[in-house]
């Protein structure tokens, strides 16, 4: 049997961020439902499981000692402490999925994404934008869970966050979830065809073996 010129591609790490109300979660859910080769990265945390949460499904639940040990072993793409509990993205589990050819979505805040970018240089960083700030405002208001004070805080935060869009590889305007999903699918397809990704998967072949494969 003739050898393949290249191996099956390694999966792509897709890091998705954007302001609250931009529709990140809805887009990620649609991608997961539509594609069986796209998986969500499961975060690790030291907080106690809530009712109905399953270890390895909702989170990887760790003790603080276990979490700190993994920090020492450099096994997090990013991590942070929030209200006394640690949260992080396990590097080993993400790498395992990528090596298996799975595409991995990491939906994360901007600060976390920038930390991931320092370690995962081959990641694809996508910023989700609302069609307009007025539309973003209406989406947040429709949730019905915000006070006037918290609304103002969210709007100010959104303005600040949008300024980070230049740190990302791609920007996708979410005026329609279906269209936004199609744009991300196109980005993923293009990324898989990048020469630098293919080069990493090329088999080491002697010149005469390559000649035989191409011209026999």
Swiss-Prot record:
Residues 11-189 form the Guanylate kinase-like domain. Its main location: cytoplasm. GO terms for cellular component: cytosol. It is found in: Cytoplasm. Gene3D superfamilies: Guanylate Kinase phosphate binding domain, P-loop containing nucleotide triphosphate hydrolases. Its EC number is 2.7.4.8. It catalyses: GMP + ATP = GDP + ADP. Keywords: ATP-binding, Cytoplasm, Kinase, Nucleotide-binding, Transferase. GO terms for molecular function: ATP binding; guanylate kinase activity. ATP binds at residues 18-25. Pfam families: Guanylate_kin. PROSITE patterns: GUANYLATE_KINASE_1, GUANYLATE_KINASE_2. Essential for recycling GMP and indirectly, cGMP. PANTHER family: GUANYLATE KINASE (PTHR23117:SF13), GUANYLATE KINASE-RELATED (PTHR23117). NCBIfam families: guanyl_kin. Belongs to the guanylate kinase family. This is Guanylate kinase.
